[in-house]
């Protein structure tokens, strides 16, 4: 089968044709904008295994901020949840879990995310049933598994 010659302009978003991405969002950090979903229910299919996938593009690289957070504020003002936060002056993404205002586990790849024009595809796979601690949290950027970490305090066995 032959293919007609079609020029391909290589850009950071060439897979998208360099066009506007429909249904994408940009948040103004000074507005404290957020999306909230309260309809997830209280009976997950698994409390031990999950995968989270998201595309994102940085608009403010030099500030520490949250990319994705979930959790709740318990009685007495204690907070629990699993934030994905930009740390180290906003250059690295840290995946962690907090319980009662204390960090249970935290994994921060060494990769710097400083390109405000690039789209990143992040996949985080959590499997607390794995016997080897480093297999319990796996992080992928653009399809490549991260193996070099700034911080690697893995979660304990069956802890979610």
Identify the function of each model-found stretch.
Residues 118-128, 139:
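Short tryptophan-centered beta-strand motifs in secreted/extracellular beta-sheet-rich domains
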Residues 150-153:
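Outer-membrane beta-barrel translocator domains and adjoining extracellular loop/strand segments
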């Amino acid at each position: 089968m032959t293919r007609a010659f079609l020029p391909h302009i290589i850009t950071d978003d060439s897979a998208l044709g360099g066009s506007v991405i429909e249904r994408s969002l940009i948040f103004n950090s000074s507005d404290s904008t957020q999306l909230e979903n309260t309809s997830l229910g209280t009976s997950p299919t698994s409390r031990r295994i999950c995968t989270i996938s998201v595309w994102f593009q940085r608009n403010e690289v030099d500030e520490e901020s949250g990319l994705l957070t979930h959790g709740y504020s318990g009685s007495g003002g204690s907070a629990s949840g699993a934030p994905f936060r930009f740390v180290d002056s906003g250059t690295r993404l840290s995946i962690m879990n907090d319980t009662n205002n204390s960090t249970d586990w935290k994994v921060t790849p060494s990769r710097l995310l400083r390109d405000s024009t690039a789209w990143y595809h992040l996949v985080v796979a959590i499997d607390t049933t794995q016997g080897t601690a480093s297999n319990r949290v796996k992080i992928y950027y653009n399809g490549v598994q991260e193996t070099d970490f700034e911080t690697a305090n893995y979660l304990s066995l069956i802890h979610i």
